[in-house]
Amino acid sequence: MAKIQFIQGVDEEAIPDVKLSRSQDGANGIAKFYFDKPTVFDVYQGEITGLYLIDEEGELSTRTVYAKFINGKPQSIEASYIMNNREEWERFIRFMERYAKQNDLSFTKAKN
C-alpha cells in the first residue's frame, strides 16, 4: 500500500498535485508536491518533520517541506523530492505508479 505522510505514522488523506521534471540525460530529476488543505493539520498541531513516501519497497523522504499560512491558518504544503540518479528516479516512479493506481490518478504530460 503506497501512502504519503508528513508525520511518521499519520497518513495524509489529501491527494497532491505532483509536477515532475528531469534532466535531458535522465541523470537526475525533481518532483514537486502541492497539497491544498492537507488533513495533517486537522489531526496534528505539532511540527511537520518531512515528506515520507511509503510503499512495500520501503520509504523515500525529504525534509524540503514548506507550509503556507493565510491569516494564521494552515492552507497548503509544498514539498520537493530530488532524485540524483537514474535508480532514484526509477524508484520514485514505481512509488508514484502504486500511489496513482491506489488513488485512481493519471499522468498528464506537459505541453511544450
From Swiss-Prot:
GO terms for cellular component: cyanelle thylakoid membrane; photosystem II. The keyword ATP-binding does not apply. It is found in: Plastid, Cyanelle thylakoid membrane. The keyword Transport does not apply. InterPro entries: Psb28_c1_sf, PSII_Psb28_class-1. Pfam families: Psb28. It is a peripheral membrane protein. One of its GO terms (biological process) is photosynthesis. Belongs to the Psb28 family. Part of the photosystem II complex. This is Photosystem II reaction center Psb28 protein. The lineage of its organism: Eukaryota, Glaucocystophyceae, Cyanophoraceae, Cyanophora. The gene is psb28.
